[in-house]
């Protein structure tokens, strides 16, 4: 608990305001899910990321709160591949919604909720009161609800901005980087050096990590020296040495460098030789997509998870399959 409080203060410091936040619950909130999308077209595809939430605002909320809801929707849209369209839904005029009013909640029961603001029926039914900008997770009627609150409009906007800019946006960069990093390994395995180089340097590929490095910069300055050393090593490999090896079409060197960079990621995420920087275990159903990506290239878990990176798993009772 003490560690969580310290991290929250550090996160909030860069925004110059205090924030009450259910850290683990907000980080692990089921924002998205994977589905088979575009059914009924030749492009029908599995593992498509779509929203797993409705963003709810009260019918009488202020324009500032409505704008904040749009900002959260913008970053959620960057994380997903689409809204879950199909010719059937379009023909029926049932294009899926993302933002709904508090009066529509009972009509749309198939997703979790992000409720932005306090002038709505959900907050009133829960009897919630807020003294400061707040991100709070509750459960009601069998689904998770992330409440974005505050004692006034200004504080609600601050909490919503934190959710959009620091939580969802960070996940966008993290998962784009992670999944494309696995694709780079697969391309190296098959000698597709140009494809690997392009994936490594693309802004939506591995370079998507630049978003996270920007967001983490205020915290990075306060990291212990041993953590900074590991991050510096990772950056040199990912952005200097590995691109060079790919240009040289040196397969063994590229695989070795990829492996070394993976180890640095494990050090930060699992606390190997340095303090553990990731304070929660990721959701298995979201994170484990990387296994299916690796499988498409003919790679198995053991091709990457061995030795110091042998650990594979998530929460207690769940493991990668």
From Swiss-Prot:
GO cellular component, one term: membrane
Keywords linked to the UniProt accession: Signal
Signal peptide, first to last residue: 1-18
Coiled-coil positions: none
GO biological processes: UDP-alpha-D-glucose metabolic process
UniProt KW rRNA-binding keyword: no
Protein name: Uncharacterized protein aq_2175
Organism: Aquifex aeolicus (strain VF5)
Taxonomic lineage of the native organism: Bacteria, Pseudomonadati, Aquificota, Aquificia, Aquificales
């Amino acid at each position: 608990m003490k560690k969580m409080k310290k991290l929250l203060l550090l996160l909030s410091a860069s925004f110059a305001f205090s924030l009450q936040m259910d850290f683990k619950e907000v980080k692990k909130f089921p924002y998205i899910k994977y589905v088979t999308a575009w059914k009924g077209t030749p492009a029908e595809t599995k593992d498509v990321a779509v929203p797993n939430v409705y963003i709810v605002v009260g019918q009488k909320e202020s324009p500032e709160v409505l704008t904040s809801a749009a900002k959260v929707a913008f970053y959620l849209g960057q994380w997903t591949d689409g809204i879950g369209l199909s010719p059937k839904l379009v023909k029926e005029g049932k294009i899926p919604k993302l933002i709904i009013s508090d009066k529509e909640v009972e009509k749309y029961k198939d997703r979790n909720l992000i409720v932005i603001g306090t002038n709505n029926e959900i907050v009133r039914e829960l009897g919630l009161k807020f003294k400061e900008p707040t991100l709070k997770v509750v459960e009601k009627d069998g689904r998770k609800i992330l409440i974005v609150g505050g004692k006034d409009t200004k504080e609600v906007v601050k909490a919503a901005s934190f959710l959009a800019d620091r939580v969802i946006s960070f996940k966008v960069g993290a998962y784009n980087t992670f999944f494309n990093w696995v694709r780079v390994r697969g391309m190296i395995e098959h000698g597709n050096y140009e494809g690997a180089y392009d994936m490594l340097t693309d802004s939506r590929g591995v370079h998507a990590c630049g978003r996270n490095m920007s967001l983490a910069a205020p915290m990075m300055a306060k990291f212990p020296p041993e953590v900074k050393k590991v991050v510096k090593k990772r950056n040199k490999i990912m952005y200097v040495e590995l691109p060079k090896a790919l240009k040289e079409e040196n397969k063994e060197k590229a695989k070795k460098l990829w492996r070394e960079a993976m180890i640095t990621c494990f050090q930060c995420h699992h606390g190997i030789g340095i303090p553990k920087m990731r304070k929660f275990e990721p959701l298995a159903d979201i994170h484990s997509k990387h296994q299916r990506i690796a499988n498409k290239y003919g790679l198995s878990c053991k091709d990457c998870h061995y030795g110091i990176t042998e650990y594979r798993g998530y929460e207690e009772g769940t493991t990668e399959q």
